[in-house]
Regions:
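Conserved hydrophobic "DFG−1" position in protein kinase catalytic cores
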Residues: 5-6, 14, 78, 97
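Conserved Nudix-box catalytic region and its N-terminal flanking loop in Nudix hydrolases
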Residues: 7-47
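Short loop segments at secondary-structure junctions
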Residues: 8-10, 79-84, 100-102
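Nudix hydrolase/Nudix homology domain
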Residues: 21-22, 90-128
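A short coil-to-beta-strand element that immediately follows conserved catalytic motifs
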Residues: 51-60
Length: 128
């Protein structure tokens, strides 16, 4: 599950992990017995001190062939507020809101594709 989190200025929230290169949309796995929306709220809280300011909308479900042929990624779009700045920790090295015209260096190719799809600048793909 990934979340495209926008603030009131229309900026996108991205995270840079300690264990992977590049900038990503926040998100993570869904635990057994956990709903997608529960996972979304947990991940945005953990990765950015974010709270939903709008109802999350399912944008698309992608097949991700990177790890297996059974991995599906649900991408949600929502507006958020940040309760306090996110300090770096063992998982998140850096995070922040970015204007779509001024993304940080190192945004992953998949993240750039998702942002283009969300903006209506690219056709929605079926594969992550």
């Amino acid at each position: 599950m990934r979340a495209a989190c926008y603030d009131e200025k229309g900026r996108i929230f991205l995270v840079r992990h300690t264990y992977l290169p590049g900038w990503y949309l926040p998100g993570g796995g869904v635990e057994r017995g956990e709903t997608l929306l529960a996972a979304l709220h947990k991940e945005i809280r953990e990765e950015g001190n974010l709270e939903a300011a709008s109802r999350p909308e399912l944008f698309h479900v992608y097949l991700n062939l990177e790890g297996s042929n059974r991995d599906h990624v649900a991408l949600y779009r929502l507006e958020v507020t940040q309760t306090k700045p996110k300090k770096p920790d063992h998982e998140i090295a850096e995070s922040g809101f970015f204007d779509l015209s001024a993304l940080p260096e190192g945004v992953t190719a998949a993240t750039r594709r998702r942002l283009a799809e969300l903006a209506g600048e690219a056709a929605i793909a079926d594969y992550w």
